[in-house]
A protein has these predicted regions:
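Thiamine diphosphate
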Residues: 1-412, ...
């Protein structure tokens, strides 16, 4: 970084030149911010006594100055000449970013109402006396009447100021801020890349995290997509099964490999490279998220479409960098956030610090964050493929949050005609009709869907109760659909009411609804208003515990 400090204004220059002993600079460095605020709130006499008066030599240094002269001693950030010099130096610098650190006064120009005064943020306007003071202080050419009417001063069209302003606006691309993108569209990967994940794994078991990593490995073989992938890992790359990326695409290091890694004899040893693609951020989630935002907004900032994929312990995502996630939404980011090792009972033995039971709820608060909690590899593949289509073919300004688990189990073949349901949030996974005495609707998401399937078998064998099993890939998307349906009906009272997707799925089904997830009950409770059936939710309210998966459940 090229750092330019603009600390003291021009009125200090003569005093600093006279200060041969360095005592003035010493005094400047002794004072803390709170003192500097008081100096500007109290006036010249106070500054003479409290700032210069500490040392006899400094009091003598300003003996020929009036209190008004001392009051004029300005801060660098309010000196047009110093600010100009700093800005000029900044634009002439090449090869590194520049930051200008300027010392200023809180509420500068507000007079008694706000200058160096601890007012609340409820102070929204100045009274007439303050406005007139502001006019006089900055020589704004307005009459008293114009000031009292709070009129703006506009320079004439031929003035130097107006010419300069227009020239700068044109160089910046126009008068109104505009989000433009001329990025070349990424060609969608062929569907056959995802075909392997639509098939049954047979007796072979794997986690949804491993399924995702295998998808990314397949995408790295696609010449159109591979250069645009940005895998970001703050920690635990090997836990997620991503060590194969180290040799394949390398870890980015701007100075290259500078050491022999301890695992150098292994096939998947750490390989750092100046042109590496993996961003290994260390245990720094804020830095990793910032890198993700940079890549996720490159389509508009740099006209380059990127596909950032940030994989992290789900507990250390939205909870730890929530404000950055909100900023990502505000910045219209496009990319994938993967909350790995998700689920409060699925990540066994890690205790309350690690066991995530609410990241999906946190994600639901960001309007353009599309979130899913898939159970099977075909669901993960369908969601990921749709994310690529929406963000990079349709160029929608959304980003995806997908939770992935570390529980290994077999994955079935993709049922027919379930794409719409997977993407909307739920689909009928299986019907158990054994002419039982009654029936229930069982809803499950993530790894807990498998517990729901097991519960269905118990209900049939031990209690003679039939059930329909629904895989809920996104309670969040179902809720959004329900709210949008409610809104349409509210705004169109004379039309036939529309039905939410949840209502369409369940209205003709018999029995109460039992919804279960590995998150707090509030997660599945979100869809309660969109059905008139009896609704029971099961979840993981409370803290996590260090125990086995079986005992936790």
């Amino acid at each position: 970084w090229n750092v330019i400090k603009v600390i003291w204004g021009s009125y200090w220059d003569q005093l600093l030149a006279k200060d041969k002993s360095g005592l003035l600079v010493k005094r400047m460095n002794e004072c803390v911010d709170g003192e500097y605020q008081v100096f500007k709130a109290k006036g010249g006499s106070y500054v003479r006594d409290k700032f210069f008066g500490k040392y006899p030599e400094l009091r003598e240094l300003v003996s020929s100055m009036t209190d008004k002269d001392i009051w004029k001693l300005n801060r660098g950030g309010h000196d047009p000449h110093k600010v100009y010099a700093a800005y000029n130096a900044a634009i002439e610098n090449t090869g590194s970013p520049t930051v200008i650190l300027a010392k200023t006064i809180k509420g500068y120009g507000m007079g008694k109402t706000g200058e160096s005064v601890n007012t609340t943020h409820q102070q929204k306007k100045l009274d007439e006396e303050d406005l007139l003071y502001y006019r006089d202080r900055f020589n704004v050419p307005l009459t008293d009447k114009q000031v009292k009417n709070v009129e703006y001063f506009k320079p004439s069209e031929n003035s130097e100021e107006m010419k300069y302003l227009k020239e700068r606006r044109l160089k910046l691309g126009g008068f109104i801020p505009e989000r433009s993108s001329f990025a070349k569209q990424i060609k969608a990967p062929p569907k056959d890349i995802f075909d392997a994940f639509m098939k049954s794994t047979g007796e072979k078991e794997m986690s949804t995290t491993m399924a995702l990593v295998r998808m990314l490995t397949a995408l790295l073989r696609d010449k159109n997509v591979s250069p645009r992938l940005v895998p970001i890992i703050p920690d635990e790359a090997r836990t997620f099964g991503m060590e194969g990326f180290f040799q394949k695409i390398g870890i980015y290091a701007h100075e290259g490999q500078k050491y022999e890694p301890v695992d150098s004899e292994q096939l998947s040893s750490y390989r750092e490279d100046k042109s590496g693609q993996v961003l290994e951020e260390g245990i720094n989630e804020a830095g990793a998220m910032s890198s993700w935002i940079a890549a996720a907004t490159a389509y508009t900032n740099h006209d380059i479409e990127m596909i950032p994929i940030y994989i992290f312990y789900s507990m250390f995502g939205f909870q730890r960098i929530g404000d950055l996630a909100w900023a990502a939404g505000d910045s219209q980011a496009r990319g994938f956030l993967i909350g790995a090792t998700a689920g409060r009972t699925t990540l066994a033995g890690e205790g309350l610090q690690h066991q995530d039971g609410h990241s999906q709820l946190l994600a639901s608060n960001i309007p353009n964050c599309i979130s899913y909690d898939p159970t099977f590899s075909y669901e993960m593949a369908t969601i990921f493929r749709e994310g690529l289509r929406r963000m990079h073919e349709k160029k929608e300004n959304v980003f995806y949050y997908i939770t992935a688990m570390n529980e290994n189990y077999a994955h079935p073949e993709k049922p027919k005609k379930c794409d719409e349901g997977i993407l909307k949030g739920m689909y009928l996974f299986r019907e158990n009709n054994n002419k039982g005495k009654t029936k229930v609707q069982l809803l499950g998401s993530g790894t807990i869907l498998r517990e729901v399937i097991a519960a269905s078998e118990i209900l049939t064998k031990e209690y003679g109760i039939d059930s329909d099993i629904w895989s809920v890939t996104s309670f969040n998307e179902l809720r959004r659909n329900g709210m949008e349906t409610e809104r349409l009906n509210l705004l169109n009272p004379n039309e036939e009411p529309k039905k939410s997707y949840v209502q369409k799925c369940l209205e003709k089904r018999d029995g109460p609804i039992i919804a279960a997830s590995d998150y707090t009950r509030a997660f599945s409770d979100q869809i309660r208003p969109y059905t008139d059936k009896s609704f029971y939710s099961f979840g993981t309210d409370g803290y996590g515990r260090s125990d086995t998966r079986k005992n936790l459940r």
